[in-house]
Amino acid sequence: MLTITSENESFARLNAPRQIINQIKEILQFRPDGYMFNPRFKAGLWDGLIKPIDGHGVFHKGLLLKVCKTLEELGYSDYAINEKDFVQFYEPAINITNLEITDADGNIIQPHDYQESAVNWALENKRGIVIAPTGAGKSLIIYLTIQSLLQSKRYKKILVLVPTVSLTTQLFSDFDEYSHSNGLKAENYVHKISSGKDKQSHLPVYISTWQSIYNIKDKSYFEQFDAVFVDETHTADSSSITQILNSCTNARFRIGLTGTLKNCKTHITALTGLLGESYQVTTTKELMDRGILTNLEISAILLKHAELPKVEYKDEMDIIVAHSKRNKFIASITELHKDENYLILYQYVQKHGKPLYEYLTKKYPNKQVLLVNGEIKAEVRENIRKITEQNNNVIIVASYQTYQQGINIKNLHNVIFASPSKSMIRVFQSIGRALRKHSSKNVARLYDLADDFTGDKRKTKNYTLSHFEERIQMYMEQDFKIKYTELDFK
């Protein structure tokens, strides 16, 4: 009889004749997008195939359902799973905690139904990815799940991975806020880790950036964790985070949280293997319809330039970011709504972000214009967040990399895409910056700028115009309101 057994909490093994393993392997393997451009493929060092199961039948535990389904489709339904090896089979359900939860002012928070649903799903399945949009309250979902695990007495060491130092601080602060009335001060059970900080503690919960711990050589460090959470899970297919999760060989509880997953087989297969199947608890549109998030209005603005011969993407971007008329137009958008705050997102720090910041600072001496990029320290970024939260007429000029995720500013009304992007994750996470409810706003606005260099004779679309059309398609699929405008920039 065929059997599926556990190697550890990261990997499982299909015990079967080589012929059957090869069948499964051939069905599950696939070529990722753009494989032909990979240097290893070009050099003949890689066949261009992603192989979720190896020649010995070993696969990531999160792919258990996929392997079982493939076996059954091939007619091998007579297989056995050692249920003692897989936590979802042998461990009884854990009940959600009934702790009293509060906000910063000590007011009682009643979790939304979708938050409780997410926690219950995580506690029942013990592996998987919770998909909830920005503003859905993922930190509360993590908090409730962790408290439930600790109360069960079955989990002694819990690791929470976040992508940035700012998120380490923010999540710790959120945990402390939620415990305002229940006596569970974060400092008494949460250990924060960042570069240069002590990696070990007697406390049960560690919050860390993956950058701070991925190069730890001592295997026992990762073996101490019996539960792992991965915030902003869409970043977890990087080799460093994969290495961490593979090393957590005793972490039988694994939950990821994200607002969006890439529509890419390589990405989804990797994350499913590391963490498990995904569960979408709600959508941005549903939360707006329920009044939990602010309604969104999108102004899609196409700037019609003189025809430009086809150039490489980098050269096209160089033209766009150095276009003085375009940058002045971006500045003019910040004059549309008095006493509101603006977030201007850019891609290139030296070529675009800093020149925009300098221009805005000179043009609007009575406004607070604040620059954010990777050079700005975490504590300064946190201070910028607080300034924006407490004031009006603030303009944040920030790089996508620093402000697309994990920044919580309720008093933010407008977002401007000063640089184009085609990344679905980047687009939706950036939009989410402005959707949190605040007494000063009834609507959040996105100004999505794009550039058309095709003219009348050119047959092919320029790169950033094609990316703009992809974004419009994304907005339409989400049923967002879009106002389309064309402006002559010739």
Label the model's feature ranges.
Residues 234-297:
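Post-DEXD/H (motif II) to motif III coupling segment of the RecA-like Helicase ATP-binding lobe
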Residues 139-144, 148-149, 154-177, 348-350:
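Conserved Walker A/P-loop ATP-binding site and its immediately adjacent core
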Residues 166-192, 363:
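Conserved helix-turn-beta segment of the N-terminal RecA-like "Helicase ATP-binding" lobe
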Residues 125-147:
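Walker A/P-loop
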Residues 434-469:
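Conserved segment of the helicase C-terminal RecA-like domain
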Residues 157-168, 319-328, 332-359, 475:
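Conserved strand-helix element at the start of the C-terminal RecA-like helicase core
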Residues 282-342:
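Conserved interdomain linker/interface between the two RecA-like ATPase lobes of SF2 helicase motors
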Residues 189-201, 355, 367-403:
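Conserved helicase ATPase core of P-loop NTP-dependent helicases/translocases
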